[in-house]
Each structure stands twice: as C-alpha cells, then as structure tokens.
C-alpha cells in the first residue's frame, strides 16, 4: 500500500498522546493510520471503513509482527462522517493502546508487540492530515 504520509523517529513514549486531525473526503471509503517501529512491525493498524473490504461503518484494527498480520479486531462505534474534519487520539502502555474517537468513545487494542516506543506513523486513504500533535 502506498502511503500518503510517513513519519519516523517519533519516539512516542508510554502515556503520551498522539493526536491526528484531518479532513475526510466527501466520498470516503476508508482510511488507515499505522503506528509502530516500521512498516513491517505495527503495534496498531487503525482502519475505519465506511464501505470497503466487505465492511461498512466499522473500525478494523490489527497488528503486524515482522511482516505477518495478526488477528483483526472490529469496533462498531463509528463516529466518522465523510466530508468532515475529524480527530483521533492514541495513547499506549505496555499492555494496550487506547484509541479515543471524535465523539469521546474510547476502546483498547492490545499492545501485541510489547512496544516501548512508537517511532513510525503512516497514513493513507481518504483522509488528508491537517495536524499531528504530541501531548
């Protein structure tokens, strides 16, 4: 998958928040935020799907360990609207990543790779990043 934005050397530590704000395309089908060590080692593949890959209004999360995908986890909370500005906040610790959605709903995804720092972020799909912040 070609990536719209790739950032490295982030050095995001446990407890710190990565906020990503951007604009969803009016005809959005899906978008992806990948976080981890590099493109083959992802502690989080965050993939909201409006209508893609057989899913509708579902968030699909996964991990990738040395190039091998893990088991998908689906979240039915879906506060995203095509054509709108949206923001996601992601924090992590040794056990889990916590994803805070635009409507305030939070859910957890296991830190399967036991990452102690997130150094890589990639974004792709029907989402134009406007701002990335660390808190």
UniProtKB/Swiss-Prot annotation:
The modification N6-succinyllysine is found at residue 108. SUPFAM superfamilies: Concanavalin A-like lectins/glucanases. The keyword Calcium does not apply. Coiled coil: none annotated. Residues 4-135 form the Galectin domain. Its main location: secreted. Transmembrane segments: none annotated. This is Galectin-1. It comes from Rattus norvegicus (Rat). The lineage of its organism: Eukaryota, Metazoa, Chordata, Craniata, Vertebrata.
């Amino acid at each position: 998958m070609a990536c719209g934005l790739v950032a490295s050397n982030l050095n995001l530590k446990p407890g710190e928040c990565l906020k990503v704000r951007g604009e969803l395309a009016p005809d959005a089908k899906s978008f992806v935020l990948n976080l981890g060590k590099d493109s083959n080692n992802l502690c989080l593949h965050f993939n909201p799907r409006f209508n893609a890959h057989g899913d509708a209004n579902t968030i699909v999360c996964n991990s990738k360990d040395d190039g091998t995908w893990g088991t998908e986890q689906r979240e039915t909370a879906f506060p995203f609207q095509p054509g709108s500005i949206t923001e996601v906040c992601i924090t992590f610790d040794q056990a889990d990543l916590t994803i805070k959605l635009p409507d305030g709903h939070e859910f957890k995804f296991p830190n399967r790779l036991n990452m102690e720092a997130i150094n890589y972020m990639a974004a792709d799909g029907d989402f134009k990043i406007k701002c990335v912040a660390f808190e």
